Design a protein with these regions (language model features):
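Well-ordered alpha-helical scaffold segments within catalytic/enzyme domains
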Residues: 309, 376-387, 432-449, 501-504
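Extracellular/oxidizing-compartment recognition motifs
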Residues: 27-364, 373, 387-394, 405-409, ...
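Structured segments of extracytoplasmic/periplasmic soluble domains
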Residues: 350-353, 397, 401, 443, ...
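Bacterial N-terminal signal peptides that target proteins for export
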Residues: 2-11
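Carboxylate/His-rich catalytic cores and anion/metal-binding grooves
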Residues: 255-264, 374-400, 453-465
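C-terminal motif of bacterial Sec signal peptides marking the signal peptidase cleavage site
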Residues: 20-22
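Large, well-folded core regions of big proteins
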Residues: 455-458, 462-474, 488-492, 496, ...
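Solvent-exposed loop and edge beta-strand segments that line ligand/cofactor-binding
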Residues: 237-238, 293-295, 358-371, 418-430, ...
Length: 504
């Protein structure tokens, strides 16, 4: 008995000693990490410009007494991070051409005693669009436990081309890259959860050119999971329009092909996935078995319909994992008019879905950061959050590039970060950038960013000078002169009075 008691005391002392020795200081602000200790940008050798290629990266490590544990990463185009099979995050936060923002996640809550697996799906689209820039693909990531890097791209992490996602597919819309079409069997997630998994041949990775790195700066998203209700055969409804990752639980009895179609409204009594000029489907080809499937990209919907094109399956659950702004609770409103109360909450819900890392005009068809829209969104953001972090990122993205590809010298893109190979722009949208800068200074006191914008604003003024007529009015502006779908666009030609009022 005395020996057993002594052994227990020794073990307890050893555990305490190990715990104390492994302590490290936590990172003060996960939003402001802007460097890697060891990680290098990597991708499959010679395939960094290949269209619509998804690679699966994994690394396993041992952890027994973790006081701190983080994953730091960035990528082009985007990633999904899981630890021991559990969803952690989607990212990164968008940035200007040739700049990349680092995300940093506390993964301590996901760790187990012993072997742990960090798994990353990374999609490289290399496609011109308004959401995810057409830039060479890469992943740069490292795992830090107790202040020490235990895995880093460039020397650790193994990558696989599992071909679970088809490459030869159409775009979701003109403004967004490729649709999701998967070919899976029930073992499709073993690569992310199985210790010492080696069921596929790894791809050869090569180091890519060094990247210009920035901090994320903005709050991390809200990933709340909520359920849909079945309202008819194969038809499901969420409580309200929702933006995030569409999930389904399925039992598949035989080889089955199915599509999950979605929209924000019903057309008649069913979903019309093409209504908004999108191909609003996620497609799966499945072998018999049990599945919990979740889209890689975020979408917007209230209604979802299941189309079984071949075979049969039983849908057991439909859910949404939100991908929305998390810091929107500062403002409150309550009165004796319930319709007014509902209107306020609808405004909050609309804002949170359109303010993840920049201000977007819509979270569905485009996910684009449009000027003009941002002028009004930024006012609401300050009311709902009490800070200007998202607005700073939005404006800074317009300041970071030395020049904009395919845009006339001095002009600003109508939306950004985005690709504009058709050379289109909205001249009067650039004026809203200047107006927003003034309000941003009043809201934030951030003189440093406004001063950085001086050259860009002066170049914009110089751009407009050749269009001034003898009356000092702008005449025959080039490209798309746009007053947000107003009939004023067509009433008067050459001298557009709404544009001149904005210019004045």
């Amino acid at each position: 008995m005395k020996i057993q008691s002594l052994t227990k005391k020794c073990m307890a002392a050893l555990v305490m000693a190990l715990a104390v020795s492994s302590c490290s200081e936590p990172i003060a602000d996960l939003r402001e990490v802007d460097t890697f200790a060891q990680a290098k940008p990597v991708w499959a050798e010679g395939r960094e410009t290949e269209k619509n290629l998804t690679l699966h990266f994994r690394e396993q490590f041992n952890s027994y007494f973790a006081s701190t544990a983080y994953v730091k990463l960035t990528a082009s185009c985007d990633y999904r991070l899981k630890v021991n099979g559990e969803f952690v995050a989607h990212g990164p936060s968008v940035a200007a051409h040739d700049f990349y923002r680092i995300d940093c996640y506390d993964i301590k809550p996901y760790l187990k005693f012993g072997t742990n697996i960090v798994a990353l799906e990374v999609a490289g689209y290399n496609d011109d669009n308004y959401y995810l820039l057409n830039q060479p693909s890469f992943l740069q990531a490292e795992v830090e436990v107790n202040g020490k890097v235990v895995a880093a791209t460039g020397k650790d992490f193994t990558a696989y081309d599992l071909k679970q996602r088809r490459q030869d597919v159409r775009e979701f819309s003109f403004q967004r890259p490729y649709i999701e079409h998967y070919v899976l069997d029930p073992a499709y997630e073993e690569w992310a959860v199985k210790k010492d998994w080696a069921e596929a041949e790894p791809v050869k990775l090569s180091e890519q050119e060094a990247k210009q790195l920035l901090s994320r700066h903005v709050p991390y998203p809200d990933y709340t999971v909520h359920q849909a209700e079945q309202i008819a055969d194969n038809l499901y409804s969420f409580k309200c329009n929702s933006s995030g990752f569409l999930g389904v639980q399925l039992q598949v009895a035989e080889p089955t092909s199915l599509r999950l179609g979605f929209d924000e409204i019903l057309s008649g009594e069913r979903v019309n996935p093409g209504r908004m000029g999108c191909y609003a489907y996620v497609t799966y080809e499945l072998q018999p078995g049990t599945y919990t499937l979740e889209s890689f990209e975020p979408y917007t919907m209230k209604f979802m319909e299941v189309y079984v094109d071949k075979g049969s399956c039983q849908v057991e659950r439909v859910y949404m994992r939100d991908y929305c702004g998390s810091d929107v609770k500062r403002a409150t409103f309550q009165c004796d008019n319930e319709e007014a109360n509902e209107l306020f909450e609808a405004a909050r819900e609309t804002h949170r879905q359109n303010a993840v890392d920049i201000f977007m005009d819509c979270p569905s068809r485009e996910r684009a950061g449009w000027l003009c829209d941002s002028y009004f969104s930024s006012r609401v953001a300050f009311d709902f959050s009490g800070h200007t972090r998202i607005e700073k990122n939005f404006l800074e993205n317009f300041l970071l590039p030395k020049a904009f590809k395919h845009i006339d010298k001095g002009m600003l893109p109508m939306c950004y970060p985005s690709d504009h190979p058709n050379q289109n722009h909205i001249p009067n949208w650039a004026m809203w950038f200047v107006l927003e800068l003034e309000e941003y200074l009043h809201r934030s006191g951030d003189r440093e960013l406004v001063d950085r914008a001086k050259t860009r604003v002066y170049e914009l003024v110089d751009y407009f000078k050749p269009f001034l007529n003898e009356d000092g009015l702008l005449e025959k502006l080039s490209r798309w002169v746009f007053v947000d779908w107003s009939a004023a666009n067509s009433l008067v030609q050459d001298v557009n009075y709404p544009s001149n009022m904005l210019y004045a």
